[in-house]
Amino acid sequence: MQEQIIRRILLHLRFPFSFFLLPVFLFALSTLPDIRPEQTLLLAVLLHLLVYPSSNGFNSLMDRDEGSIGGIERPPPVPIQMYKVSLYMDIAALSLALLYLEKTVVFLLSGYILASRAYSHRRIRLKRRPVIGFLTVSLFQGPAVYAMVVCTNTICIGSAAWWPGLATSFLLVGAGYPLTQVYQHAQDARDGVMTLSRLLGIPGTFLFSGLLFAALGLALGWYAWQLSARPTAAVTALLLLLSPVLLYFLRWAAATRQHPDNADFRHTMRMNLLGSTALNALFLTWSVLNHLPSHVR
């Protein structure tokens, strides 16, 4: 019985799902001229191995989903022990951040955890409200994480130079987030949750995400051309790596117009995996290009 509880807890923490949230972190690194390796690695561990999984587990506990959820096609019941596990993981993350990272990062990390709890908790349930739920996820998984990375590696003084990065990180999350809800309409309706995707409908969700993807493409193109040390190589990498993602999105959107049942768990997870892999590869490539010795450039 104890082993079964542990297996279920580990499953609902959804550690592999952190890969889908990695692009914002890597994007922020790709825009920085200098990096503090030890602090950056610690922040990456705190976010991707403690805070994100803790948020996943708490969300599963509150949702009590019986159908597919992000990363799990057939989720088992969530053990009640998940509440304490998620709490201890958050405490560990904040304690380590308080010891080794900037106070601003601790503040942002605390805000992320509180927003995550407010999003999922049955008594608050921000996810019930389509616009507020969308903004909560997009702002805290996007600009807040971007700011954490910047503040970990530079003097944390807000300036106009931050705005393009904050806006782009918002688009990185906001463009794809409604697509993760398209297969959960019936499940969300039973739970009394009106997500943005339910509000827009399946065709509206693809149109909305398509518009944000277009804005994201323009923002990334501007970054590649204006800020990269090797703009031609950066733009080439952008086109090569993101073209397959665009093609898949367009084909999937067309398929759902013909048969709405194609807005399902498996298509969504493929989109997540393809998009995250391409973006992670792109931002790693940009980081390498921006930190090559000048004689190599």
Segments predicted by a language model, with ranges:
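Small-residue-rich segments of transmembrane alpha-helices in multi-pass membrane proteins
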Residues: 20-28, 77, 134-150, 197-205, ...
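Short, Lys/Arg-rich, polar N-terminal cytosolic tail immediately upstream
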Residues: 1-10
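Acidic (Asp/Glu-rich) catalytic motifs at the cytosolic membrane interface
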Residues: 47-73, 175-197
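Intramembrane alpha-helical segments
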Residues: 2, 76-156
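Multi-pass membrane catalytic core of lipid/isoprenoid biosynthesis enzymes
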Residues: 64-110, 194-228
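Membrane-embedded alpha-helical segments that form the functional core of polytopic membrane enzymes
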Residues: 21-58, 105-117, 158-179
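Extended hydrophobic alpha-helices typical of membrane-associated regions
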Residues: 123, 228-297
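Hydrophobic alpha-helical transmembrane segments in multi-pass integral membrane proteins
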Residues: 143-156, 215-220, 275-293
